[in-house]
Amino acid sequence: MSLFNHLLSRALPLWLLFFINFLVLLGKSQQEVLQVQVGIVLDTNATLAALSLRAINMSLSEFYNTHNGFKTRIVLNIRDSKRTVVGAAASALYLIKKREVVAIIGPGNSMQAPFLINLGNQSQVPIISFSASSPVLDSLRSPYFIRATHDDSSQVHAISAIIESFRWREVVPIYADNEFGEGILPYLVDAFQEINVRIRYRSAISVHSTDDLVKKELYKLMTMPTRVFIVHMLPDLGSRLFSIAKEIGMMTKGYVWIVTNGIADQMSVMGESSLENMHGVLGVKTYFSRSKELMYLETRWRKRFGGEELNNFECWGYDTATALAMSIEEISSNVNMSFSQTKRNTSRDDTGTDLDDLSFALSGPKLLQALATVSFKGVAGRFQLKNGKLEATTFKIVNIEESGERTVGFWKSKVGLVKSLRVNQTGIKISHSSHRLRPIIWPGDTIFVPKGWEFPTNAKKLRIAVPKKDGFNNFVEVTKDANTNAPTITGFCIDVFDTAMRQMPYAVPYEYIPFETPDGKPRGSYDEMVYHVFLGEFDGAVGDTTILANRSTYVDFALPYSETGIVVVVPVKDEREKGKWVFLKPLTRELWFLTAASFLYIGIMVWIFEYQASGDFRKQSIINKISNVFYFSFSTLFFAHMRPSESIFTRVLVVVWCFVLLILTQSYTATLTSMLTVQELRPTVRHMDDLRNSGVNIGYQTGSFTFERLKQMGYKESRLKTYDTPQEMHELFLKKSSNGGIDAAFDEVAYVKLFMAKYCSKYTIIEPTFKADGFGFAFPLGSPLVPDLSRQILNITEGETMKAIENKWLLGEKHCLDSTTSDSPIRLDHHSFEALFTIVFVVSMLLLLAMLVCRRYRQESKSGEINANNSPTDGNMRAPPNQPTDDNMRAPTSPPIDDQVLEPPGPALNEADDQDQLLNDEVNVGDRNEVDIIVEVDPTLVHRRNLITSKTIPTRRAALFSRIKSA
């Protein structure tokens, strides 16, 4: 017992010491969890603020449950801003001075933000807002303002892409008259300027406006032609706006309404009646990818709060709380979370305010740096600040219906509008669908795309000025009814304008106003008419108004609808070939010489061929030979060569030569006929410089700008004559300069085309063609009609419509195929017949070569026969192979015909002549009767029939016939 007591007395102090140490460590561990004060300034009575607070509390709870080892814990201090700027400022000041918060989450809108930003900058307390999105706040340039959301300016390119895709040319922004509404306007203007879209009017509506004031503003918009409205305001004012718009009939067919994310992101908190009033509206909404973090949060949210869906602001609030908790934990180990006791302003006078003794947070710079570098994958996408704000790269385009919203497409930076996005593990991929939106239900429950521009029924018509002309009325003609004095406007320019206006994507009422004096005379020049458009007296000018640089400073011209250029018209004269030697003109000198040389060449070749084939030809004298040969050659020109040729080579050559002559003579005949019958119209003046040097008179149209152009080119004013009509222009040409007329006219292509349609055979156009921009329709500077009208003019000029209008007014029933001078008939030269003459030459050479080869072969065959006849022969002749071998049918044993030399009857020839005659005579191959007679006389020659008929054995024709005769 004493031992136990002894041990107990010794161990008790140790147990007590252990227990005391445990309590100390336990207390120390409790003291290591640092409570960090964070303020929240929101409109707590607003639905959106209440939902955002739930998301913030849920974010901090889940974050610290997941990171229970963190040494810091955020303690939220919530203050109500009471929906006023003063209330927000007072709440922030209280949190900084009384609670010494190291950061403030808020405010709830952009109007309350400026004062809080300045307050945070002075106290080094970061102001973190996930709902103040106005770009105006960037101008404060405060490093202590962090925008945990997207800038409103990031959506303007998505809006401009929608406007551009439907080719609307004018829009009217309707925005809240405060910092939030005005902040986006400069960015909208820049975005629309890039796509040439005009902002016709800016409608600012105060959040405090009564329904009557809103209705008055909407009625004002109804009187304007623009039907595309972009609404940028918060849901409270937006709901009232659309309710009144539906009431007065602005949610019907033809209207286009596009809302920014100020309304589109908060449609989940808007009532069903508001959505019903917005049926057919397009919305640009912030897009969050369906990440696993977002889907897990939605599951937990439904379990905790029922079936309510998360909106964008709840997601941003959730990520904002997470980012702030991570940043505070990061700096907690080496930064004091308290406030400095040194005041910013140490003034002790009675004029000081609560701001004068405002202290500053020691953790401010480090916390700001930690927030700038924090990065994690949140429920709203990657949370990573760039220049103090989150960046948006994708927006969702929704079509608002009575039951909610329907996605019709997306907009992605650097890509544009797409129908859908396909999300996979590698990120967002653009679908292969066309860069257009899905079908949209527009206001009025229609699927047809509104034109975007309509003239109201109570709007006045456009006053279009038309010139009063004394001539060239085919372009514009003003006639008046004798009874009513009502003007009737017709002409080429009027038809083009009416056709283009009918094809416009919207209806434009207009009326023509003649630019004339009360007594019906022209009121002034075209420059004066254009200037009155500039002054606003007219809404446009239609007529044969030339587009000029000086006029374009006062008005905007649509694209030209007529041919451009200024040309010079001069008379033409007939210069047909005349004279006794005209028959030589069709062929050039070279071709005449080539043809004559070819005749000589053919004659020589015929001589060579006939000399070898015809014995009679060799017996003729040299003069007869030459005359016969060249008569034969030249007679082929008329195909009158009746004497048959003896040589096959001559016949082939003559056939080829006759073919060449046929082509040559036909071409000669056609050219000569053209020279004698077709007019060769030549201009009296070849070039514009000839007019300047000759000093002749030049005509121009009265009131035309060509007068100044001619003076600039150096022509004397005394030499310039005016005309009003094509007939007067023609009469001046007939007078010529010597009688006070003109020798040339300087005018635009359109007028010249009309003149040439009537007098095309008497005048022509000479070079050069001077530059001019053609006729165009004039409108006031910046008119939205110009781009659309220009597009319709292009459609007209590229199709058959313009041709039909020109045929109606400018060409009529008479068409000039060519307004230039007629070319004289082309003379035939040797280049056109080189191939034919080459063929003749090649064929003749081949025939000559063939003749030489045949002659050499005959000579060799003859030599072989002579040698065979002089050799010893067998006394008994063998019967031919085809003869019967019967003893009673033996062949006669007459000696071979070549072995007998029979003298023909008549005078004897001397030995030399006889030998020469025998060596040169041949059996005519084509005469088969002669050979048959020879065989019948001497049957022993049957076996020699082939030799006789093959032209290879020279025979002595006279000796053979002598033998036949004696037999």
UniProtKB/Swiss-Prot annotation:
Gene3D superfamilies: 1.10.287.70, 3.40.50.2300, Periplasmic binding protein-like II
Subcellular location field: Membrane
GO process terms (BP): calcium ion transport; calcium-mediated signaling; cellular response to amino acid stimulus
Tissue expression notes: Expressed predominantly in roots.
Compositionally biased intervals (Polar residues): 864-874
Region Disordered, residue ranges: 864-913
Membrane-topology annotation of the record: Multi-pass membrane protein
Extracellular compartment residues: 32-590, 673-832
Residues in the signal sequence: 1-31
Glycosylation sites recorded in the entry for this protein: 45, 57, 121, 336, 345, 424, 550, 795
GO cellular component terms given for this protein: plasma membrane
A GO term, aspect molecular function: glutamate receptor activity
Quaternary assembly: May form heteromers.
Cited function: Glutamate-gated receptor that probably acts as a non-selective cation channel. May be involved in light-signal transduction and calcium homeostasis via the regulation of calcium influx into cells.
UniProt protein name: Glutamate receptor 2.6
Source organism per UniProt: Arabidopsis thaliana (Mouse-ear cress)
Lineage: Eukaryota, Viridiplantae, Streptophyta, Embryophyta, Tracheophyta
Gene designation per UniProt: GLR2.6
